[in-house]
């Protein structure tokens, strides 16, 4: 079984029914009796106070797992590349001075609000303790599967593009931070709020 990791300065978060929605992607142990089988990607089909019924994406097998058995799905670029019905590559945002450079960025439209958002992604390797400490001071709690995160923390920040002035032919827009996320299920929640289509499981993750 993969391990949850704790970044210094943050306290473990206990997850429960209020943290998840139907359709959310999670990692869960294939077998509770044989940890050597590892975790597989699954989605939540039903919920109650103690746990949820999940369906493994690769096998369609249905099992019940308590919330303590679940692990967050780290953000990787496959989720953006393989969901073009939601995301479009972008390159028009630059990091603030002193911040890490973006690993990649995308844009998407909130159909419900007629608003366009940018999502920029940082990738930080676990040994980069100084950067972690700074992010923790800014309020970041980061937990995920150690194996599935490929040795790095991925932090995505969503920004709304707000027009602040107009010059002939175009608006000058300023990005305004909306939220910071570290897991796919949090991204799913925001996209649902925006009226976007549901994310499909990247084929590369199913084949891995």
What are these regions (language model features)?
Residues 34-48:
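Short beta-strand-centered aromatic/proline hotspots
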Residues 2-20:
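Mixed-charge, Lys/Arg-rich low-complexity intrinsically disordered regions
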Residues 182-208:
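Acidic, proline/glycine-rich low-complexity IDRs
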Residues 52-53:
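Short aromatic-glycine-enriched beta-strand elements
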Residues 59-87, 184:
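Intrinsically disordered, low-complexity, charged/polar segments
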Residues 57-61, 94-178:
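Acidic, low-complexity, intrinsically disordered interaction modules
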């Amino acid at each position: 079984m993969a391990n949850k990791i704790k970044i210094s300065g943050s306290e473990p978060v206990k997850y429960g029914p209020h943290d998840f929605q139907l359709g959310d992607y999670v990692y869960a142990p294939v077998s509770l009796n044989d940890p050597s089988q590892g975790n597989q990607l699954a989605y939540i089909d039903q919920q109650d106070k103690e746990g949820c019924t999940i369906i493994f994406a690769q096998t369609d097998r249905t099992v019940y797992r308590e919330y303590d058995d679940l692990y967050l799905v780290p953000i990787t670029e496959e989720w953006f590349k393989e969901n073009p019905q939601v995301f479009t590559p972008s390159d028009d945002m630059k990091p603030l001075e002193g911040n890490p450079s973006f690993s990649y960025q995308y844009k998407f439209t909130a159909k419900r609000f007629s608003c366009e958002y940018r999502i920029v992604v940082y990738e930080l390797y676990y040994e980069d303790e100084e950067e972690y400490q700074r992010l923790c001071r800014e309020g970041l709690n980061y937990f995920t599967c150690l194996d599935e995160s490929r040795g790095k923390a991925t932090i995505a920040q969503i920004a709304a593009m707000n027009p602040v002035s107009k010059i002939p032919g175009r608006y000058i827009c300023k990005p305004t931070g909306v939220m910071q996320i570290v897991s796919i299920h949090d991204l799913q929640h925001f996209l649902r709020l925006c009226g976007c289509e549901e994310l499909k499981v990247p084929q590369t993750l199913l084949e891995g």
